[in-house]
Amino acid sequence: SPSNSKCPDGPDCFVGLM
């Protein structure tokens, strides 16, 4: 998972990055 603490583990994380 990304080092971004604001980004939770899981598909939602990738959606947020996009």
From Swiss-Prot:
Q: Which domain of life is it from?
A: Eukaryota
Q: Which residues carry this modification: Methionine amide?
A: M18
Q: Which UniProt keywords apply?
A: Amidation, Disulfide bond, Neuropeptide, Secreted
Please give the InterPro entries that the UniProt record associates with this protein: Tachy_Neuro_lke_CS
The places in or outside the cell where this protein is found are: Secreted
Please give an example of a GO cellular component term from this record.
extracellular region
Predominantly, its location class is secreted
KW Disulfide bond (keyword) present: yes
Provide the disulphide bond pattern: C7-C13
For this chain's UniProt record, which GO biological process terms are given? neuropeptide signaling pathway
**Keyword Disulfide bond set for record:** yes
**So what does this one do?**
Tachykinins are active peptides which excite neurons, evoke behavioral responses, are potent vasodilators and secretagogues, and contract (directly or indirectly) many smooth muscles.
Which protein family is named in the record? Belongs to the tachykinin family.
The protein's name in its UniProt record: Scyliorhinin-2
Origin organism of this chain? Answer: Scyliorhinus canicula (Small-spotted catshark)
